UniProtKB/Swiss-Prot annotation:
InterPro entries: Antimicrobial_frog_2. Its main location: secreted. Disulfide bonds join 28-34. This is Brevinin-2Ec. Shows antibacterial activity against representative Gram-negative and Gram-positive bacterial species, and hemolytic activity. Belongs to the frog skin active peptide (FSAP) family. Brevinin subfamily. Keywords: Amphibian defense peptide, Antibiotic, Antimicrobial, Cytolysis, Disulfide bond, Hemolysis, Secreted. GO terms for cellular component: extracellular region. One of its GO terms (biological process) is defense response to bacterium. Signal peptide: none annotated. Expressed by the skin glands. It is found in: Secreted.
Amino acid sequence: GILLDKLKNFAKTAGKGVLQSLLNTASCKLSGQC
């Protein structure tokens, strides 16, 4: 249903956000710019 679709989209968006921040943290640590 609609609720399930909303939950799926939310999970996708949240997952992307987490991945993005992990990547940002990793790259700043590697370059020593944290």
